[in-house]
Regions:
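Extracellular glycan-interacting surfaces
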Residues: 1-350
Length: 350
């Protein structure tokens, strides 16, 4: 069975890739709009065509049609700005949302025609904020039940909800329970077997709503696990109720946990790791065609993989510069040997 391609977005080495389960790693070739040492903040597969990969970068939005072999810079109104988040609608690949942020001005952009035209959301986002100086749009989520409902969140600047496909937005973080509720790291919406759930990871709390954000319950990770900082929150494509969450002692952090929920965030199980990670788990992603295959990357470059849904993990030998987002494509990239940037590692080959 093919293991597909691992893609690791980094701040300083663009997108690193492996098509042989981490034995060898390859950086981008020369002569492309996306430099091999670019800052990449977001890596997003097109769920309908996972050989197509979008990257949020320091030059704007880039796209690859061949699992990251070659890249082109998309011509958009936000070209040249830092893109922090990209999300492609799994029901309609032409509908794409993009969030910009520090050092650029934070904004939400929408295209309904695969990038031919872009519209900036009419949302008042301040240029500066208290927590991180300049806001960045980190979180985007589609509603799997109602395609007209969407969510986005800012670090730092609030939680927003749309009921009309993203034309109009309402700020709703005032309904959350604890301080620092405007600092949003991630959002997931799950169908949950007919009992739809919205789950939000704030800097210091994890929230859950069963009524589309009207009321919330939640927990403080520092009280439950001794780690105050909530970061990654991921769900397998099409999952009814499975979630992965990362907790840490801060950013970049010195320790971190991965938790899994099988009941849409009502309860959580700490997953076993083969060793202590060196920093906060920053990104968790699954193969969209096989949810047992999981990648998890830390802020300071550790990469862990699981092929049994997180029951067991392997730390990969290759370590990276700052990891920003990971992705696992089921498509095996055809990587030219000349692009290989590291030699095979003996332990990986064995």
């Amino acid at each position: 069975m093919s293991e597909g391609t691992w893609l690791v977005g980094t701040a300083g080495q663009a997108v690193m890739r492996s098509n042989d389960r981490g034995v060898t790693w390859h950086r981008l070739g020369l002569g492309q709009p996306l430099e091999f040492d670019a800052v990449v903040r977001s890596v997003c597969l097109d769920p309908a065509e996972p050989r197509r990969v979008y990257a949020g970068t320091d030059i704007g939005l880039c796209v690859s049609q061949d699992v990251g072999n070659t890249w082109e810079a998309c011509q958009t109104p936000f070209t040249g700005q830092m893109v922090w988040k990209v999300l492609v609608d799994p029901r309609n690949s032409s509908r794409i949302f993009v969030g910009t942020g520090a050092p650029s001005r934070a904004a939400l952009w929408r295209t309904l025609d695969a990038g031919l035209n872009w519209e900036r959301a009419a949302v008042d986002i301040p240029e500066f904020c208290a927590g991180v100086n300049r806001p960045r749009l980190l979180a985007l989520a589609f509603d799997p039940v109602d395609p007209d409902q969407l969510w986005f969140g800012l670090e730092e600047g609030g939680l927003f909800h749309s009921r009309d496909g993203g034309a109009a937005w309402e700020r709703v973080d005032g309904r959350l329970l604890w301080p620092f509720r405007s600092d949003i790291h991630n959002i997931q919406v799950l169908a949950n077997h007919g009992k739809k759930v919205v789950v939000v990871a704030c800097v210091n709390a994890v929230y859950r709503s069963l009524d589309e954000g009207q009321t919330w319950t939640g927990f403080l990770p520092n009280d439950t696990h001794g780690l105050y900082y909530a970061r990654a929150l991921s769900a397998p494509l099409g999952s009814e109720s499975t979630l992965y969450l990362s907790l840490s002692d801060g950013t970049p952090g010195t320790s971190s946990l991965i938790l899994r929920s099988s009941d849409a965030g009502e309860s959580w199980q700490v997953l076993p790791l083969p060793q202590q990670p060196n920093s906060c788990f920053w990104s968790i992603a699954m193969d969209p065609t096989d949810h047992r295959k999981v990648l998890a990357g830390t802020k300071y470059g550790h990469l862990f993989t699981s092929v049994d849904g997180g029951n067991s993990w392997q730390k990969q030998w290759r370590e990276f510069s700052e990891i920003t987002e990971v992705a696992w494509s089921p498509v095996v990239a055809s990587i030219q040997v000349a692009h290989r940037s590291v030699v095979p590692h003996e332990e990986a080959v064995a």
